[in-house]
Regions:
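Active-site-adjacent alpha-helix of alpha/beta-hydrolase-fold enzymes
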Residues: 24-29, 131-141
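Helix-loop-strand module that forms the ligand-binding subsite of alpha/beta enzymes
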Residues: 56-137
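N-terminal beta1-alpha1 ligand-phosphate binding loop
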Residues: 2-32
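Short beta-strand elements in bilobed, periplasmic/extracellular small-molecule ligand-binding domains
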Residues: 33-41, 45, 140-149
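N-terminal beta-loop-helix "entrance" segment that forms/cooperates
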Residues: 39-56, 154-159
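Glycine-rich phosphate/pyrophosphate-binding loop and the adjoining helix
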Residues: 6, 140-182
Length: 182
């Protein structure tokens, strides 16, 4: 059975720079693991009032995470922090699957997670937040995170061009993630 890596792209915009980075990371994983992308665009804002019955979008996100061996988050920087959409997703996924045991296993429990980001500033702050958050929600951070800036021409033509050093970093990140789940 093939190992599975779930990609979470933090920008819901079609063709976002972080989605373009994810496509490059997918190339680095080609032939090594099965990659899928999580569509969490229908996820409601977290509220305990919505936990029972389980919202279909929450159930689908949990199922996708449960069958994955690892998660790779591609996160823009919004005001030097995690995008609200990603934080909301992690809030849902970190909740105990059995609500009668609030410290019980979650969909994210012990998952291997790595993070990459395309943004023009704030990578250090963003990565520090993820490095604090990931162990708190009982995941295992893997390897060094990859940061990239948006090339100037991308603002006009919407085409991200990653520098060779970034592509090499994504290759190393992919290798570290594959090794973690073997």
């Amino acid at each position: 059975m093939s190992k599975k890596v779930l990609f979470i792209v933090g920008s819901l915009r079609q063709g976002s720079f972080n989605h373009q980075m994810a496509l490059e990371a997918e190339k680095a994983l080609a032939g090594k693991v099965e990659v899928s992308y999580l569509d969490y665009s229908a996820l409601p804002l977290f509220s305990q009032d919505l936990e029972v019955p389980t919202h279909p979008a929450v159930a689908a996100a949990r199922e996708a995470v449960l069958v994955a061996d690892a998660i790779w988050i591609f996160s823009p920087v919004y005001n030097f922090s995690i995008p609200g959409t990603v934080k909301n997703l992690l809030d849902w996924l970190s909740r105990a699957l059995d609500l009668s045991d609030t410290r019980g296993v979650s969909a994210l429990q012990d998952k291997f997670v790595t993070v990459s980001s395309v943004a023009n500033a704030g990578h250090d702050q963003l990565f520090a937040i993820y490095k604090d958050l990931l162990p708190f929600i009982r995941t295992q951070g893997v390897g060094d995170f990859t940061a990239a800036r948006v090339n100037d021409s991308a603002w006009a033509d919407r085409k991200l061009v990653l520098e060779e050093t970034v592509l090499n970093s994504l290759e190393k990140q992919a290798q570290d993630l594959v090794e973690a789940i073997q």
